[in-house]
UniProtKB/Swiss-Prot annotation:
Its EC number is 4.6.1.17. Keywords: Lyase, Molybdenum cofactor biosynthesis. Substrate binds at L75, C76, H77, M113, E114. GO terms for biological process: Mo-molybdopterin cofactor biosynthetic process. The lineage of its organism: Bacteria, Pseudomonadati, Pseudomonadota, Alphaproteobacteria, Hyphomicrobiales. InterPro entries: MoaC, MoaC_bact/euk, MoaC_sf, MoCo_biosynth_MoaA/MoaC, Mopterin_CF_biosynth-C_dom. This is Cyclic pyranopterin monophosphate synthase. It catalyses: (8S)-3',8-cyclo-7,8-dihydroguanosine 5'-triphosphate = cyclic pyranopterin phosphate + diphosphate. Catalyzes the conversion of (8S)-3',8-cyclo-7,8-dihydroguanosine 5'-triphosphate to cyclic pyranopterin monophosphate (cPMP). GO terms for molecular function: cyclic pyranopterin monophosphate synthase activity. Belongs to the MoaC family.
Length: 158
């Protein structure tokens, strides 16, 4: 079984020492969904939600959150991110919104948590901005889709 890197030999939590790792290009892609009533999706798409531009604010919230991941998740390294993209796309088949975040850096540790944080906070922002219209919305399927770079190489979800 693979050892948990954030625990020392006694089981105490520790921040992983990455100082000897080479700096490489690292990228991660994550996704999530906010499922809602068709009427709520139509309201958001029309731009008439009470709190304003739900899609635009969710994108900005995701980007901002990605940059603060180390303040939210214990033992995460603060990273200099070189790229954060958050896309929020209406999906009438859900019905709801599909959120995708791509994060990139050149550094000594990966950006998976930053991509997942971007998606999570974008989804929470959507919920917050539309809850007056639909408290039954569901945030679902937040997951890492792929990562590249670093010692462990590339990985893609099945």
């Amino acid at each position: 079984m693979t050892r948990l890197t954030h625990l020392d030999s006694t089981g105490a939590a520790r921040m992983v020492d990455v100082s000897d790792k080479p700096s490489t290009t690292r990228e991660a892609l994550a996704e999530g969904q906010v499922v809602m009533a068709p009427e709520t999706l139509a309201l958001i798409q029309s731009g008439n939600a009470k709190k304003g531009d739900v899609l635009g604010v969710a994108r900005i919230a995701g980007i901002m959150a990605s940059k603060r991941t180390h303040e939210l998740i214990p033992l995460c390294h603060p990273l200099m991110l070189s790229k954060v993209e958050v896309e929020v796309t209406p999906d009438e088949a859900l019905p709801g919104l599909h959120v995708v975040a791509r994060v990139k850096t050149a550094g000594q540790t990966g950006v998976e948590m930053e991509a997942l944080t971007a998606v999570s906070v974008a989804c929470l922002t959507i919920y917050d901005m539309a809850k007056a219209a639909d408290r039954g919305m569901r945030i679902e399927n937040i997951r890492l889709l792929e990562k590249s770079g670093g010692r462990s190489g590339d990985w893609r979800a099945a």
